[in-house]
Structure formats: C-alpha cells, structure tokens
Amino acid sequence: MTENIRQIQVSNHVMMQEISRMFTLGKESVTITVRGYSMRPFLEDRRDKVVITPPETPQIGEVVLARIAPERYALHRVIKKENDSYIMQGDGNPLYMTERFTQADIIGMARTFIRKGKPHQTTDFTWRCYSFVWRMLKPFRRILLGIYRRLP
C-alpha cells in the first residue's frame, strides 16, 4: 500500500516559522529535504532528508538548523563556541565560509540523516566517526571535494 504524501514548496522563512510553531505545539520531529550543496559529501541536494528535533544546547560537531540572518537559515555543523554565540560551517563549504548564531536562533537539531533512502542516527558510532574524520580533514577538504564532484 502506497502512502499518499503531499509535498509543497514554501519560502525558507515561512517553513522555519512553521517548524518552530510545530515544536511549540509539541511535535517531536519534522523531516525536511536537503537543498543546496553546503553539506557535501554527507548530504546531497534534493536527494537526502534530515529529521529535525526541537532546539537544545548544541555541542561542537552537531548539526543544527539555525537562523543566521533575517530570513536566512542554514543546516550546518557547529565548529566553535564563542561567549554567547556559536560558529557553524557547512561540511562542503570553504574554510573561510562560516556563520554565527545564538541559542535563540536555533530552529532545531539534526538527529537523523536519511541518505540515499537509508536513515543514519547522529548518535550512531559510524556516523560519529565519519563526522570526526571529516572535521579533522579540514585543511584537505577543498581537494577532497574537488575529487568527489568529479566522481560518477
């Protein structure tokens, strides 16, 4: 039996307001489709999905959905905490491309990645190892991503 799923497209701002409202009303998670290439090689544009849960205090290495400017949002990895703010960066972004946000800017936490149709919990040992290794390869990412983009 096939489930009827209705998809709609709305602006990011409208979607983030709705996700925040749903969490306020007690919804435990929301699944969104990835748009963009900033989280390559882990997440691919329009192919992969992310299960977002209500906001918590993020740890270094966790992926959060946050407002980074008025009506601008990003799903990126937390790389640093500075005083009352956090610094985030997309896994596929150049080293100089970072965004700053505060706890109040967090829309939600990425807890499950659905990659090529297969769910991966962010708490899984394998996923945590991949994330750790990728963070350690920061100086070589540009080269590695160049190779990755050329793969069939």
Language-model regions: role of each:
Residues 1-57, 116-152:
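Protein maturation boundaries and topogenic segments
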Residues 26-30, 48, 60-62, 72-74, ...:
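A generic structural signal for short beta-strands and their flanking turns/coil linkers
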Residues 56-57, 67-152:
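Acidic/glycine-rich C-terminal interaction modules and beta/coil loop segments
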